[in-house]
């Protein structure tokens, strides 16, 4: 389940207006709804990932769940520590997405904040998965790396394109629709 959720999360980069191949395939509102739905599903499963690592220990008889949890949070393994940090970033991303209209009056500021958090999240969690991925073969890890690289390119293109477009509109003396308070 975590493999599917991680893949869904990385694919969120491709369910944005920055990914030009999808833009012409349907109305943007449908793409945003799919982005939101897949985001909630993947975040929902991944927030329970630590519990799913610890709880089965109850039935194995070797180590108790609390001892397993304590071992995880007191480790010095950088990949596990980045997994914990990624969990906190993911929780922040989820909460700010749900409370977006209360926290941000300007849609562009929220979108930029959301994009930066998403890149931080995927970088941190990507390292965690590539180093610790028990269920991933070398081919699967290569697939993840390609998806991550494509996601980064999509984000860079989106924000570079937005900067160019904003400059073009400013030169014409016009205001972008995204600069208004409504999304």
UniProtKB/Swiss-Prot annotation:
Q: What is its subcellular localisation?
A: Cell membrane
Keyword Repeat: yes or no?
no
Q: Which UniProt keywords apply?
A: Cell membrane, Membrane, Transmembrane, Transmembrane helix
Membrane topology annotation: Multi-pass membrane protein
The GO cellular component terms are: plasma membrane
Q: What parts of the sequence cross the membrane?
A: 37-59, 79-98, 110-132, 142-161
Q: What is the name of this protein? A: Uncharacterized protein AF_1462
- The organism named in the record is Archaeoglobus fulgidus (strain ATCC 49558 / DSM 4304 / JCM 9628 / NBRC 100126 / VC-16)
Provide the taxonomic classification: Archaea, Methanobacteriati, Methanobacteriota, Archaeoglobi, Archaeoglobales
């Amino acid at each position: 389940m975590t493999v599917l959720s991680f893949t869904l999360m990385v694919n969120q980069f491709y369910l944005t207006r920055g990914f030009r191949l999808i833009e012409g395939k349907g109305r943007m509102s449908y793409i945003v709804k799919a982005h939101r739905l897949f985001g909630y599903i993947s975040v929902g499963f991944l927030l329970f990932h630590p519990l799913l690592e610890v709880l089965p220990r109850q039935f194995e008889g070797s180590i108790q769940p609390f001892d397993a949890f304590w071992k995880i949070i007191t480790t010095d393994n950088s990949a596990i520590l980045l997994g914990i940090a990624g969990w906190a970033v993911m929780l922040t991303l989820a909460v700010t997405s749900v409370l977006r209209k209360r926290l941000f009056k300007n849609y562009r500021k929220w979108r930029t904040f959301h994009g930066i958090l998403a890149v931080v999240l995927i970088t941190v969690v990507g390292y965690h998965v590539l180093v610790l991925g028990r269920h991933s073969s070398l081919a699967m890890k290569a697939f993840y790396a390609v998806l991550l690289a494509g996601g980064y390119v999509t984000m860079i293109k989106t924000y570079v394109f937005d900067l160019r477009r904003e400059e073009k509109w400013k030169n014409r003396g016009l205001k972008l629709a995204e600069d208004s308070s409504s999304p």
